[in-house]
Amino acid sequence: MTQESEGTTPTERSGTEKIVLAAILIVLAVVAGYYLAKNLIPTPKIGVIYLDTQVTDLLDDTMTREINYAKNADDIKGVVMVINSPGGGAAAGHDIYFQVRKLRETKPVIASMDTLAASAAYQIGVGANEIYAKPASIIGNIGVIMGQPSPETLSERTITTGPFKATGGTATSWLQMLDLLHADFRDSVVAERSKAPNPLKLSPEEVATGEIWVGVEAKEYGLIDQLGSRLDAIQRAAELANLKNYQVVDVRDEYLASLTGDQLSSTLKLYEKVDNQPELNLTSEETKWPTFYQLYLPLE
């Protein structure tokens, strides 16, 4: 008759082995789950949109595509708009401004002003949740310019209905329209900046003189929220989106990567046109009708 050796019995050893095996399987499952989740769940992104040329209808087209892509991309949790522009066409600027406001309703948007963010470019920036700028960034120039076509005499064979069919109105009426657009620009800046984290300190009249300010002054007057780098703006967007781990991406690159075939080809051609567009000329002989601009245009 044999006796069990001192220590654990076979039954006890079997139970211990099962526990160890179960623990190993649990650890392996956790590790596998981690790597699986890492591969299947996309890393949250902060998307960067660059506005680095004059504001035109062509730019409006590309900005519309990028803003819509950023708005609809589930993995893009926040957006930084890097702005370096003297402004441009009033209508194109208004369109981009309204789109930025819509974007901020779905995810945080931070404007990062580079060397120059003037006129329409500044208005686009005030559509963001917050504005960052460098101490030497040029900010402001809130006003409107009207570009007139070269005067031409109507042919005697040209017949029009009504006294203003050819001209659109009197010189006085055009000036009144200019004043209306100026007031609208001023009011949009005052409304947006009055509720900003660093609220506006200037009166509506002081805002709308067309003056420019450097970033240090703009911070003091409440035209921007913080002095800081592009990286600071990105970190702020991530903070507002409650992100600690994230990837920074160029929205243009992400958008183009989503296209194929003819759609990609036509879009690349559009971007090429934007990158090579000539500077706006308010007195061009090719201008067919008066046009309103929100453009920083230093007089020579």
Regions found by a protein language model. Name each.
Residues T2-K107, Y122-Q123, G127-P197, D250-E300:
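Small-residue-centered hinge/linker elements
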Residues S119-Y122, I234:
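Short, well-ordered alpha-helical microsegments
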Residues D184-A238:
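Flexible, glycine-rich surface segments
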Residues G93-I96, A118, E211-I212:
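Generic non-transmembrane alpha-helix signal with a bias for helix starts/N-cap capping motifs
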Residues N84, M113, S173, E205-E206, ...:
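Conserved short-loop catalytic and cofactor-binding motifs
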Residues I110-A118, E206-G210:
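Glycine-rich beta-to-alpha transition loops that act as phosphate-gripper elements at the mouths
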Residues V109, I131-Y132, I224-L227:
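Short, well-ordered beta-strand core segments
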Residues W213-G215, R230, I234-L264:
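Extended, charged amphipathic interaction segments
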